[in-house]
């Protein structure tokens, strides 16, 4: 951080705009995925990263995933918590097993809810600035024939949709409505196959649909005509991009849209006249500011004034905070 000492007898205005690297460089968006094969098939997080990169955005993605597992498994797995603590994530995605989210409320509240809570409690403790997103998955191609209530696609999808939205409300989280974009493509473009031959996993086209839905949800913008390289039919690709745009952006309130938290940008001007100093904050994205004049006096005014009792060198300190972040900016002056 640049420092300079002011030695002016009469009147000086010092403009200091906060020389911090993140105020200039492209911000990275980091996402941790906790889930199973519906997340890692075709390395969907990597496709998301490619879409973002093609649109000039920088992403860091990582996973804590194991095939076929539910939230009970993830809540008892050490890697889940190691990954939560490993970075200040912008988003942490939670994806349960499709069958567990297709159960009645009573079963979900017993078999899933406590384990989702355990994971989210850890997120709120160790990564409080992270936005929690629930990855709403899709119904199996023909539903699950083992359970009469979800023995067809529509019944299974409806239950999955309902439970993920309920969990979003319970935990003040957002939803990535992959399952609803999936339904839109099934209904509007029946010639597009999204399913693996096993009738529940995604083929590459289905994973691209998931990635487009994540991109639209996280960045609040369309993936339409992005230049990422992906080996699917152009007409299928265009339909998926339009469907994710329509379903996500036309229903942001329904998905409990949670934009990425903005970084605090510190900055202040200093006006000096003799031993009198006037500070003016031009910082951004903060809730509270507190000043330290370097002589034992502090202030919480936005534009505080202070008279130093004696000449000398003083370190002016601006302390900014939001509900989960803090930034400090210091500037040294000399008062004659």
Q: Where is each model-derived feature located?
A:
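Structured segments of extracytoplasmic/periplasmic soluble domains
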Residues: 37, 41, 47-55, 95, ...
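Alpha-helical cap/lid subdomain in secreted, periplasmic
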Residues: 83-204
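Short alpha-helical patches at coil-to-helix transitions and adjacent helical residues
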Residues: 41, 204-211
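Extracellular/lumenal mature domains of secreted and surface-exposed proteins
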Residues: 259-336
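Conserved SGNH/GDSL esterase-like catalytic core that processes O-acyl groups on lipids
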Residues: 28-32, 38-119, 128
């Amino acid at each position: 951080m640049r420092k300079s000492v002011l030695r002016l007898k009469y009147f000086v205005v010092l403009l200091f705009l906060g020389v911090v690297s993140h105020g200039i460089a492209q911000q990275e968006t980091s996402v941790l995925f906790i889930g199973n094969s519906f997340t890692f098939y075709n390395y969907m997080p990597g496709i998301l990263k490619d879409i973002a990169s093609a649109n000039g955005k920088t992403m860091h993605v990582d996973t804590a995933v194991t095939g076929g597992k539910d939230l009970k498994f993830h809540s008892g797995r050490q890697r889940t918590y190691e990954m939560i603590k490993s970075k200040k994530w912008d988003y942490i995605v939670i994806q349960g097993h499709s069958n567990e989210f297709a159960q009645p409320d009573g079963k979900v509240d017993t078999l899933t809810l406590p384990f989702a809570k355990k994971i989210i409690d850890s997120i709120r403790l160790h990564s409080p600035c992270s936005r929690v997103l629930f990855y709403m998955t899709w119904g199996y191609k023909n539903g699950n024939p083992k359970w009469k209530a979800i023995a067809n696609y529509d019944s299974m999808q409806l239950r999955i949709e309902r439970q993920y939205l309920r969990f979003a409300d319970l935990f003040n989280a957002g939803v990535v409505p992959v399952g609803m974009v999936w339904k839109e493509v099934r209904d509007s473009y029946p010639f597009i196959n999204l399913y693996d031959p096993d009738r529940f996993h995604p083929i590459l086209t289905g994973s691209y649909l998931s990635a487009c839905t994540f991109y639209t949800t996280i960045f609040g913008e369309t993936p339409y005509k992005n230049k990422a390289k992906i080996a699917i039919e152009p007409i299928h690709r265009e339909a998926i991009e339009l469907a994710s745009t329509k379903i996500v952006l036309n229903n942001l309130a329904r998905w409990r849209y949670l934009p990425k938290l903005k970084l605090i940008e510190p900055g202040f001007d200093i006006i000096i006249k003799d031993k009198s100093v006037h500070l003016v904050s031009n910082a951004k994205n903060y809730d509270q500011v507190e000043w330290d004049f370097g002589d034992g006096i502090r202030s919480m005014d936005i534009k505080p004034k202070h008279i130093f009792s004696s000449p000398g060198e003083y370190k002016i300190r601006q302390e900014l905070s939001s509900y989960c972040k803090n930034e400090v900016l210091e500037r040294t002056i000399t008062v004659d």
